[in-house]
């Protein structure tokens, strides 16, 4: 007697069709296309989680650069000056200070200027 494993295959199909419920057209109705779009969506989600880290870093650098230029330094000069002064602060914290606490950010700029000799 041949066993087709109907319960598990039905469960698998149900899971995928539930996931693609909001998709359009045949991607939602036909199992073979739904499966492809399901795996494609998971791939995009995986890639997005990886790209998010770089995107946030770009945003932080842009915010720091704007605030540093308002204080009279370029971004790369600020970072180099902080490294020369042995100040260990990451870009996320610098960006937070630049947006939410400009006075303390100016202190870091002054430390960097002193280390650079400006």
UniProtKB/Swiss-Prot annotation:
Q: Name one GO molecular function term.
A: structural constituent of ribosome
Listed PROSITE patterns: RIBOSOMAL_L20
Q: Which Pfam families match?
A: Ribosomal_L20 (PF00453)
- InterPro entries xref list: Ribosomal_bL20, RIBOSOMAL_L20_CS, Ribosomal_protein_bL20_C
What Gene3D superfamilies does this protein map onto?
A: 6.10.160.10, Ribosomal protein L20
CDD domains from the UniProt entry: Ribosomal_L20
**One Gene Ontology term from the biological process aspect of the record:** translation
Annotated Gene Ontology cellular components are: ribonucleoprotein complex; ribosome
Keywords, A to Z, come to: Ribonucleoprotein, Ribosomal protein, RNA-binding, rRNA-binding
Task performed by this protein: Binds directly to 23S ribosomal RNA and is necessary for the in vitro assembly process of the 50S ribosomal subunit. It is not involved in the protein synthesizing functions of that subunit.
Q: Which family does it belong to?
A: Belongs to the bacterial ribosomal protein bL20 family.
Q: Which NCBIfam families match?
A: rplT_bact
The entry's protein name is Large ribosomal subunit protein bL20
State the organism of origin. Answer: Fervidobacterium nodosum (strain ATCC 35602 / DSM 5306 / Rt17-B1)
């Amino acid at each position: 007697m041949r066993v087709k494993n109907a319960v598990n295959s039905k469960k698998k199909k149900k899971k995928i069709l539930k996931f693609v419920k909001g998709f359009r057209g045949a991607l939602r109705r036909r199992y073979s296309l739904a499966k492809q779009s399901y795996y494609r969506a998971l791939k995009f989600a995986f890639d997005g989680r990886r790209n998010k880290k770089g995107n946030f870093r770009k945003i932080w650098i842009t915010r720091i650069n704007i605030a540093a230029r308002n204080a009279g330094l370029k971004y790369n000069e600020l970072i180099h000056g902080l490294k020369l002064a042995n100040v260990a602060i990451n870009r996320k914290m610098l960006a937070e200070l630049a947006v939410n606490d400009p006075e303390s950010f100016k202190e870091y700029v002054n430390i960097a200027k002193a280390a650079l000799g400006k």
